[in-house]
């Protein structure tokens, strides 16, 4: 069975032992130990992941007891039953831009001495979440969470074995690094234009998913599709236009599920975006006020998959919503019906957003 590089790294961290079997490894800028995984502690994990993301990435390793640091393994199936989409939604509701992460688990075989003095082999389940270093720093809290003392606008950073609010020196470093990245990106664009000519170029705007071409045909792609493409596709260097000069010829391969990530055609707007807000509320059998709150909370107007603003005159605009928007809201309403307090909180935040 193929072992991922992250599993290998976690096993390496856990391999350093003292004579009594306790872990020699300590928590540091890239490692956090947790005894168990609890769905009610998502904010705790998200805060640590945001801190890792703002530094150089890192691992949360589950199944490790503190004081003394020893491997006990996970005692229930909470970690194995994680719904990754739900966890992603919970994390990205708290922090922005999106945090990229992976998780996994494995069985660690440990030698132990039982009550009879016999050496036995015990299987212990270890879980891990790896957080990538963010390409777009800083990752910022966009929502309050009183239990973890998270306030909208907070920036967390990983310092040695602690997650803390970022200090001046590290914030200055992030700002300088981002400015350098933008300068380097501009230089690359200018160099590419100089070598290839502006008339041959197309531009992808990752913020709105718009692909502009030199042929007068623009295509809008859902941002999640672009993210999945960049994450899942494998870029394989297979030669170049010239053996001695020129840019490499890249073949793009990958197995990407496009079931719900189909680019939205703009030719027939009434068919693609059939609902105004009043019609959408009627379809969902909810009040317009509740609909406005849900649209605001889930930021649906920011995605062309769900929403399109149409100018009808010099002073008037209308908001149209897609069939994807109807399906998305139906699912969310079913979820919120099971948690009335959450729905009331959404409506309350919407009503107080400008106060």
Swiss-Prot record:
Keywords: ATP-binding, Nucleotide-binding. It holds the Pfam family SLFN_AlbA_2. The keyword Nucleotide-binding applies. ATP binds at residues 58-65. One of its GO terms (molecular function) is ATP binding. It comes from the Bacteria. InterPro entries: Schlafen_AlbA_2_dom, Schlafen_AlbA_2_dom_sf. This is Uncharacterized ATP-binding protein UU034. It comes from Ureaplasma parvum serovar 3 (strain ATCC 700970). The lineage of its organism: Bacteria, Bacillati, Mycoplasmatota, Mycoplasmoidales, Mycoplasmoidaceae.
